Amino acid sequence: MKVAIIILSLALVAAVFADQNCDIGNITSQCQMQHKNCEDANGCDTIIEECKTSMVERCQNQEFESAAGSTTLGPQ
């Protein structure tokens, strides 16, 4: 069950990045919607938080890579 949830979370992460939408409000909504049918009463909040953390980290990495890729050295 947790493996399926993780796979779905990764698919959601890819979909959000495809849109380049890293707004925390959107991330929260997407994770909550993705896991709305969670059956683990004690673990659902944790799963949603892990989803959000993963998506935020990927957004930060994407922003860092974009910034690094746009840096040029020498005359332009």
UniProtKB/Swiss-Prot annotation:
A GO cellular component annotation in the UniProt record: extracellular region
Signal peptide: 1-18
Keyword Glycoprotein in annotation: yes
Disulfide bond residue pairs: 22-59, 31-51, 38-44
Record keywords, A-Z: Disulfide bond, Glycoprotein, Pheromone, Secreted, Signal
Reported function: Water-borne pheromone that attract the marine mollusk Aplysia into breeding aggregations and coordinate male and female reproductive behavior within the aggregation.
Complexes and interactors: Binds to temptin and enticin.
Name of this chain's protein: Attractin
Name of the gene encoding the protein in the UniProt record: ATT
